[in-house]
């Protein structure tokens, strides 16, 4: 009985760590898409938009640069398809 409990606990921990790793990877990917030159930003909000309202729209928020949109669409990441080697 004790071995079954340990096995179940091990499976639950592995699933939890897997979910956590996936969430961190998605968060990192989101951050990477928001990094761009201010002149490349395409407005996604409205005057006076808050960071929370902006992120709820699925957009990026950065109010550190005046004169450019603070709430803006994330940069699209191009999916690079794997090429098969002709070997």
From Swiss-Prot:
InterPro entries: P_trefoil_chordata, P_trefoil_CS, P_trefoil_dom, P_trefoil_dom_sf. GO terms for cellular component: cytoplasm; extracellular region. This is Trefoil factor 1. It is found in: Secreted. Residues 1-21 form the signal peptide. Residues 32-75 form the P-type domain. Its main location: secreted. Pfam families: Trefoil. Disulfide bonds join 34-60, 44-59, 54-71. It comes from Mus musculus (Mouse).
């Amino acid at each position: 009985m004790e071995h079954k409990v340990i096995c179940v606990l091990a499976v639950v921990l592995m699933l939890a760590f897997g979910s956590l790793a996936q969430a961190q990877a998605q968060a990192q990917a989101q951050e990477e898409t928001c990094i761009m030159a201010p002149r490349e930003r395409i407005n996604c909000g409205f005057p006076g938009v808050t960071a929370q309202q902006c992120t709820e729209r699925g957009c990026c928020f950065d109010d550190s640069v005046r004169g450019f949109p603070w709430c803006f669409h994330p940069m699209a990441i191009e999916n690079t398809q794997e090429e098969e080697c002709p070997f």
